[in-house]
Amino acid sequence: MTQAVTLLLAGLVVFVTHALEAITGFGCTVLALPFVTGLFGVKQGVEILTILAWILSLYIVITKVKDIVWHEFTKILIFVLAGLLIGMYLFHHVDSAPLKRILSYFIILAASVQLIQFVFPKVGQMRMPKAVGYILLFLGGIIHGMFSSGGPLIVLYASQSLPEKGNFRATLCLLWVTLNSIIIGSYVLSSSITRPVTTKTLVMLPFLAAGIVFGEWAHQRVKKETFKVLIFSTLLLAGIVMLVA
């Protein structure tokens, strides 16, 4: 596969996944991970997606700041930060092969949870105990520190504490901006953002911009449930393929 084809395929993945996050406020990194890490490698792919997700989330925060629920953001941030530091340590000190296997299991779990909520709506409506919610936030922080994709676990909590669509999207995007700023800072301090990472990130920017434009247009026009069922079905398959490959 030529480099041009690889970049085009990665760009198409970035467009689709970041359009979905522009609609919902969540999902771009975890959806893009199996494909982009397959094309660029685990660590390089994670770094590129972290930067792109930061840009997208910052755009939504700036344009939708009035929708942020600050007390919920603060609560979520405290528990997630505790796990984030552990995840960042693991990312820098664990080999890529074990990381990829952990990532595969995580993707399968996250996709399965989301699909179960669509098949059995009452599961998503059940109120979880506060302690369980806080544990999910902590675990989500660990996953986010490793792969910048702790969203699925954090969303399980936030979907109950932030039931309004606009509040949900804006508050979570502020969380992603905060967490990814810390992670990107660690990349800079460890000199892991190399020239290839910078170049590929720049190439992905037009695809990101197109995803934002389409996602904002679709936010008011397309049922997000239709998008998410198809996307998480694909994600589940991708996680299985990554596990057995």
Q: PLM features: residue spans?
A:
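Selected transmembrane alpha-helices and immediately adjacent juxtamembrane segments
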Residues: 1-39, 123-172
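Hydrophobic residues within alpha-helical transmembrane segments
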Residues: 12, 16, 51-58, 74, ...
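Hydrophobic alpha-helical transmembrane segments in multi-pass integral membrane proteins
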Residues: 45, 86-91, 141-149, 183-184, ...
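Transmembrane helix exit motif
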Residues: 58-65, 102-128, 216-217, 221, ...
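Structural signature of hydrophobic alpha-helical transmembrane segments
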Residues: 6-7, 12, 36-54, 97-107, ...
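Juxtamembrane helix-boundary/capping and inter-helix hinge elements in multi-pass membrane proteins
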Residues: 38-42, 62-68, 159-167, 191-194
